[in-house]
Amino acid sequence: MYYSAGTYEAFAHPEKPEGVDNKSAYIIGTGLAGLTAAFYLVRDGQMKGERIHLLEKLELAGGSCDGYRDITKGFYMRGGREMDNHFEVMWDTFRDVPSIETPGVSVLDEYYWLNKHDPNYSLCRASVNRGEDAHTDKQFKLDKESAMALSKLFLTPEKDLEDKKISDVLPDSFWDTNFWLYWQTMFAFQRWSSALEMKRYLCRYVHHIDGLPDFSALRFTKYNQYESMILPLVKYLESHGVRIEYGMDVKNVIIETEGNKKVAKQIVYVKDGQEQTIDLIEDDLVFITNGCCTDTSCYGDQTHAPDLSKVKNGAGESWDMWKAIAAQAKHGEFGNPDNFCSDVDATNWMSATVATSNEEIIRHIMNVCKRDPRSGKVTTGGIVTVKDSTENWYLSWTINRQPQFKSQDKNTVLVWLYGLHTDREGNFVKKAMRDCTGEEICREWLYHIGVEESRIGELAATACNTTTCYMPYINAFFQPRKESDRPKVVPDGAVNFAFIGQFAETPRDTIFTTEYSMRTGMESVYTLLNVDRGVPEVWGSKYDVRELLRACYYAVDKKPIDELPLSFGEREAVKLLLKKVKGTDVELL
């Protein structure tokens, strides 16, 4: 497997890999990583669909990319997905997946046209004083010490950041900047999150620095992620004969190591309460989704808080499977799951979905976001962060294009919100978020969008239906780590197995993205089948001097060099540099 850039490799069709007709594939998990692996087995690996088996524990494909309607409880959306124009593997995939809504076009075409006609941007990034615009005004407000520390982090080798927290490398003044407000709430980082991962994010999205304050860097799907991404991919695979076998609870993959050679020999699973096995030969390829950020999700509804009785450090079936596999490693080459799943207090947050058609509430929504949520177009343009709640639940909320579900009534608006601090009291509701019913969480949100206090109780109870989800491991992949804590996509010496998903290690890309999962799926197939075509490299904006200079300009809020808070020595050095480059192409840059 090798990386490439440019259209020569991107537009080429690889030859059929040698021996593929004798091979079969077993893919554990039907999240984006597993579905993408199946896609590349079909399209580029040219494996017959009948020889590809997706093993899924649940009754629905999609993994963490879900979105569904419970007939009795309402709509559930655990999370949302923000996309980038340089998700190279994602767009390489969806350019060949047919739309299930618009005949004759691809999912990429449909998505491209939508975001061209209705580009995303926010008119209110944060609120204060119960619904007033906080006027962050696209400013980062970085002080000199914070700006220098970010620059140093950008340039620090990953090896030097292993097992370090963000708080280990950035000054206290950084937490009060708009940069951190944008960053933390957009990506769900915490102060104790991995400094290594923050460096990757800085490098990966340096070309989007100017679009972070108002989300103009982002693109969104028309409907929820399940209907817009998962369903078309599933239908594509099914049309090629790929089988999804539901109710398959995989417990272990038995791997034998002889010298430097590692071979998957057996899959152990439970179906209908009975433990069973699948024996494997070297021509049987196994793709393992190790770990899951939504494992042990706990659901609540309008009148019930989520039941957290089963939540404890390390508990979860995806972790149990990974631990069973990791225990077979001779030198830790299958990763260290305990690094990610052993501190629920650090890795949890909670989301909620509010459904309403109440005109009074919608007027308050429009007062904040300056748009009509029932227009069918961009509404909030990304999350609105409630600055007043930073020491409480730390709420952010968003309304994507409506309807979010094809079955959604045209008068109903779905609001998604989340809180980073589930153990703290709310500003209005004096309970920990995780202990609250949907109705109580709705009250807190109504309070922050400016609804009169005397009206909040009645509206939350009768004009809204709120479902909730507490996710103990949703930030697990942000835990400080070293390179060996996640197994390589294809470990050294592995003959017929690979690790895929958010807890597999691939260089340069960032977790908590659709692209990361899909990239591991593509890389795993290309490696095990030796597909002779380049995997598109992670977009290299960090190597583009134009993007770096542009990012510096926006990071200091577009101040000219002579207005920056520089010391006398620094100013003199800048003057000398500008004199040296005068009349050159560097000056033009």
Predicted ranges, named:
Residues 1-25, 43-51, 551-589:
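Extreme N-terminal leader/targeting segments of oxidoreductases
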Residues 29-35:
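Glycine-rich Rossmann-fold phosphate-binding loop(s) that bind the pyrophosphate
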Residues 37-50, 236, 240:
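A short, Lys/Arg-enriched amphipathic alpha-helix followed by its capping loop at the start of a domain
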Residues 42-69:
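Glycine-rich FAD pyrophosphate-binding loop
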Residues 72-113:
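Conserved FAD-binding subdomain of flavin-dependent enzymes
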Residues 100-207, 219-220:
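Rossmann-like flavin
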Residues 203-285, 289-291, 303-304, 309-311, ...:
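Helical element adjacent to the flavin cofactor pocket in flavoenzyme catalytic cores
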Residues 206-221, 283-285, 290-520, 526-540:
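C-terminal segments that line or cap access tunnels to active or ligand-binding sites in enzymes
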